[in-house]
Swiss-Prot record:
InterPro entries: CLAMP. One of its GO terms (cellular component) is sperm principal piece. The keyword Phosphoprotein applies. GO terms for biological process: gene expression; single fertilization; sperm flagellum assembly. The lineage of its organism: Eukaryota, Metazoa, Chordata, Craniata, Vertebrata. It comes from Homo sapiens (Human). Disulfide bonds: none annotated. Residues 236-271, 309-331 are annotated as: Disordered. The modification Phosphoserine is found at S34. Keywords: Cell projection, Cilium, Coiled coil, Cytoplasm, Cytoplasmic vesicle, Flagellum, Phosphoprotein. This is Cilia- and flagella-associated protein 119. Residues 286-317 form a coiled coil. It is found in: Cell projection, Cilium, Flagellum; Cytoplasmic vesicle, Secretory vesicle, Acrosome; Cytoplasm.
C-alpha cells in the first residue's frame, strides 16, 4: 500500500517537474526570439543609419563621387525621351518656334536665366535641325536625340576625362540602330545615315567635349603633399606671450606712427633636429654633385684647349714642298 502511494506521489512530482521544464523552455524560446528580433531590428536600424550617413556624406563631399559610375549597357533608345506625340508637336513647328516647344518637352526651366539649360537647349535644337536636313523620319529623329542625350549624361557623370569610354559607348549605341538583330538591335538607320550621324556628333559634341564637361561638372582640385619616410611632420610652435605683446605693439605703431617706441626683434624659432639633419644631408649631396659636374666641365675644357693648340701649331709651321718638286733642272 505504501509502495503504491509513494510511486503515485513520485509520478505526480515527476510530471509536475516536466511541465515546469517545458514552461521554462517556452519562456527561453520566447526570450531568444525576442532577442533575435531586437538584434535584427538594431542591425536594420544601424544599416539604415549607415546608408543615410553615407548618402549624406556623398552629397556633402564632392570628391566622394569623383570616380565615374559604370556606363549603362547599349540598348535601343527609340521613343525614349521624345515619344510619338512629342515628335508630332515638333514636326509642326518651324526652326524659330522649335526652342519653346523643345524647352517644354525637355522640362527645362528658364534657359534665359540658367546657362546650362540654354546650352542643353541649343544642343538639341541643332540636332533636330540636322535631322530635318538629312530627311530623318520621326523614329530616326527620336532615336538620334535619345542617343545624344545618353551620351551627354555619360559625359557629365564625372569631372574626370572619359572621352574614350564615351566614344565607345556612343558607337555601341549607334550600332544598336543599324543592324537587324532583335531584340538587341534594329535596322533603323541606313549605312549612309549612320555615317552622317556619326560625323555630326564627332564634329559637334566630341569637338567641344571638354567645354561641356567644364560647364556641367564641378571643379576638382588635386593637392600634392610630400611625406618623408622616417621623419615626423613639423609641429607648429605655439605663440608665446612676448610674441603676442610684440604683435600688439606693431599694430599700435601702425595706427599711431608719430609715437616713438622701442623696436623689438623676435628671436628666431629653433628648428627641430630632424629638419636640420635633412637640410645638411641635402646640402652635402648637392655639393658632391656640383663638384662632379665642375670636374667634368674642366676636363672637357682642357681637351678642347689641347685640340685647338694642336691645330694652331700645325697652322704656324712653314709650308714645305715635298722633295724633288722644288729642285730646278740644271743645263
Amino acid at each position: 500500500m505504501l509502495n503504491r502511494k509513494t510511486s503515485h506521489f513520485l509520478g505526480m512530482r515527476v510530471q509536475s517537474e516536466l511541465e515546469h521544464l517545458s514552461e521554462l523552455r517556452r519562456e527561453a524560446g520566447k526570450d531568444r526570439s525576442s532577442v533575435h528580433g531586437s538584434a535584427a531590428r538594431t542591425r536594420a536600424s544601424v544599416r539604415t543609419q549607415w546608408t543615410t550617413a553615407a548618402a549624406a556624406k556623398a552629397d556633402e563631399d564632392p570628391g566622394a563621387n569623383l570616380f565615374p559610375p559604370p556606363l549603362p549597357r547599349p540598348r535601343i533608345c527609340m521613343w525614349k525621351y521624345l515619344d510619338v506625340h512629342s515628335m508630332h508637336q515638333l514636326e509642326k513647328t518651324t526652326n524659330a518656334e522649335m526652342r519653346e516647344v523643345l524647352a517644354e518637352l525637355l522640362e527645362l526651366g528658364c534657359p534665359e536665366q540658367s546657362l546650362r539649360d540654354a546650352i542643353t537647349l541649343d544642343l538639341f535644337c541643332h540636332a533636330l535641325i540636322f535631322c530635318r536636313q538629312q530627311g530623318f523620319s520621326l523614329e530616326q529623329t527620336s532615336a538620334a536625340c535619345a542617343l545624344l542625350q545618353d551620351l551627354h549624361k555619360a559625359c557629365i557623370a564625372t569631372p574626370l576625362g572619359n572621352v574614350e569610354e564615351c566614344y565607345r559607348y556612343f558607337t555601341s549605341v549607334l550600332f544598336c540602330h543599324g543592324v537587324r538583330r532583335p531584340p538587341f538591335s534594329i535596322d533603323l538607320f541606313k549605312e549612309e545615315q549612320l555615317l552622317a550621324l556619326e560625323d555630326y556628333v564627332v564634329n559637334t559634341y566630341f569637338r567641344h567635349f571638354k567645354l561641356y564637361k567644364y560647364v556641367f561638372t564641378p571643379q576638382v582640385r588635386l593637392d600634392l603633399s610630400l611625406t618623408y619616410m622616417g621623419l615626423q611632420p613639423p609641429k607648429l610652435w605655439p605663440e608665446s606671450e612676448t610674441e603676442k605683446e610684440e604683435s600688439k605693439e606693431m599694430e599700435e605703431q601702425a595706427v599711431t606712427p608719430q609715437k616713438e617706441e622701442l623696436e623689438t626683434v623676435a628671436p628666431p624659432e629653433p628648428e627641430p633636429s630632424h629638419i636640420h639633419v635633412l637640410r645638411a644631408y641635402i646640402k652635402t649631396q648637392v655639393n658632391k654633385e656640383l663638384e662632379q659636374l665642375q670636374g667634368l666641365v674642366e676636363e672637357r675644357l682642357k681637351a678642347s684647349e689641347e685640340r685647338l693648340s694642336s691645330k694652331l701649331t700645325a697652322l704656324e709651321r712653314p709650308f714645305q714642298l715635298p722633295p724633288g718638286k722644288g729642285k730646278s733642272k740644271t743645263k
